[in-house]
Amino acid sequence: MQLLEKLWDETTPIHLRQIQTVEIMRLTWVHQYFVERGKVRLRPAKDLPPAGQRFDSPYDPEAHYANKRTTTWVGYKVHLTESCDENQMHLITNVLTTHAHLADVDQTEKVHKALKLKDLLPSEHIVDSAYVDSELLVTSQSRYEVTLIGPTRPNSSWQAKPLKHMI
């Protein structure tokens, strides 16, 4: 914090504030900390900017916070696609690296596009529930002739909840 205060002192040459590394450090501090009564405090999670809009690491401004169930990290996600044909070697057919905060379900079509470009589209694509929704079940077949196989998540919207009768 003292370094940032010195850099923004009116006697400090302005060009020092314009160094990219200094700006990344400043934004990381703004996103993660605040000063209260002269003391540096960590921002509560509820006051942080959304994961895709904040700097979570001064070392890599593209690395973002993510969580999946009980695991949390700052970095990226890697989506691997593997061939699973019987009596054949299992081979990695596609690697897609994304920002960690992006939803897995939004990567399914990107994987299919990449596999199509390489002429490696499977007739069936077995995935976990994070990569399936009702729209993808239809569009994977209609656009790519791929049968998407995987459990769908339960509908948790308010419309899907049982009606409670008013008394």
Residue spans of the language-model regions?
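Anion-binding and metal-coordination hotspots
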Residues: M1-I167
